[in-house]
């Protein structure tokens, strides 16, 4: 791969797969930003080896603008030097609500000589992971109530699991318990979406099952770095789904039966032993998506009333996608 193609891929990777956190190593002379993102289906490209370790990609960019010279950007990936170049354009905007920065890089070209490559000075403290709060997700969402609110027929809708959510037009669409009912919902550590709740009550007991409990290869996007010894909430990612549905459409209820009140009428809850996935097509009718199954094999219609269909903002949807390799593979097919 030539340097021009390599830099073209790097530019698009930085612009379309990274959100940034300003690092405490920044000074008046050199600005340091870090980003962490799940492994990419597109970068570093075919037949190119990923620098450093396996797992999430940790990126550091160090920006210097000497007097009377063009900006120089130095990139490290997983601690390995990748490139030192000049962006033909550069844009930076802080998003205080989430403690992140949006960086945009133009074409990457050779820097002016002489070019001194600075060492990687980014510092990272072993701090707890940072997650999107329920309030942040709700405040970023738009309610979809009518057929006119749904994506147009020509728009590709990508289902991420048997019960949603869906990605369309850069927005994550998911059924969520009506916010007015959240006070009644037992804490499951994340926004109580339909897919999360159904997976929660049907997950297997094997905590090493990546399908039910998530894997450790998720990136902590809001921290700007993913450390090797921590699991960053992958058990609440939309990629998680009951392992019992790998080869079928039925998942037996295994735990947390107190959550059934959000799924089925009171008179039928004691009879339901499993959940059947009916269709993962985006719809305003929840009863087209799943139903309950009794011991006798009879189907029980689910409740429609507790559920609202929300579309998350493009930025929050990017945060979710950038944290998960599986979602990237499904939704990020080209630059």
From Swiss-Prot:
Localisation per UniProt entry: Virion tegument; Host cytoplasm; Host nucleus
Highest taxon of source: Viruses
One GO CC term, this protein: viral tegument
Tagged with keyword Cell membrane: no
Pfam family, one: Herpes_UL16
Disulfide-bonded cysteines: none
Entry keyword set: Host cytoplasm, Host nucleus, Late protein, Virion, Virion tegument
InterPro entries hit by this protein: Herpes_UL16/UL94
Subunit structure: Interacts with cytoplasmic envelopment protein 3 and with the capsid.
Similarity annotation: Belongs to the herpesviridae cytoplasmic envelopment protein 2 family.
Role this protein plays: Plays a critical role in cytoplasmic virus egress. Participates in the final step of tegumentation and envelope acquisition within the host cytoplasm by directly interacting with the capsid. Upon virion binding to target cell, a signaling cascade is triggered to disrupt the interaction with the capsid, thereby preparing capsid uncoating.
HAMAP family named among the record's database cross-references: HSV_CEP2 (MF_04039)
Name this protein carries in UniProt: Cytoplasmic envelopment protein 2
């Amino acid at each position: 791969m030539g340097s021009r193609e390599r830099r073209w891929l790097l530019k698009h990777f930085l612009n379309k797969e990274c959100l940034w956190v300003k690092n405490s190593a920044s000074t008046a002379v050199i600005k340091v930003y870090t980003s962490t993102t799940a492994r990419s289906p597109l970068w570093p490209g075919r037949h190119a080896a990923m620098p450093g370790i396996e797992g999430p990609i940790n990126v550091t960019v160090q920006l210097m603008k000497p007097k009377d010279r063009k900006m120089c950007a130095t990139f490290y990936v997983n601690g390995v030097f990748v490139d030192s170049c000049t962006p033909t354009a550069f844009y930076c905007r802080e998003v205080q609500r989430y403690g992140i920065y949006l960086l945009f890089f133009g074409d990457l070209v050779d820097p002016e000589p002489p070019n001194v490559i600075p060492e990687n000075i980014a510092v990272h403290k072993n701090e707890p992971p940072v997650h999107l709060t329920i309030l942040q997700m709700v405040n970023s969402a738009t309610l979809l109530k009518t057929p006119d609110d749904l994506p147009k027929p020509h728009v590709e809708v990508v289902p991420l699991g048997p019960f949603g959510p869906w990605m369309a037009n850069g927005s994550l669409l998911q059924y969520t318990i009506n916010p007015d009912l959240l006070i009644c919902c037992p804490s499951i550590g994340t926004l109580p979406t339909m897919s999360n709740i159904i997976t929660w009550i049907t997950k297997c007991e094997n905590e090493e099952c990546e399908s039910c409990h998530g894997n450790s290869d998720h990136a902590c996007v809001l921290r700007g770095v993913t450390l090797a010894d921590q699991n960053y909430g992958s058990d609440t990612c939309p990629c998680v789904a009951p392992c019992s549905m790998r080869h079928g459409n039925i998942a037996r209820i295994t735990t947390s039966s107190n959550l059934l009140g959000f799924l089925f009428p009171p008179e039928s809850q004691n009879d339901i032993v499993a959940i059947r996935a009916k269709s993962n097509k985006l719809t305003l009718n929840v009863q087209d998506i799943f139903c309950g199954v009794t011991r006798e094999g009879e189907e029980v219609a689910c409740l429609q009333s507790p559920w609202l269909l929300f579309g998350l903002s493009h930025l929050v949807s990017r945060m979710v996608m950038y944290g998960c390799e599986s979602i990237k593979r499904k939704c990020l097919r080209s630059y």
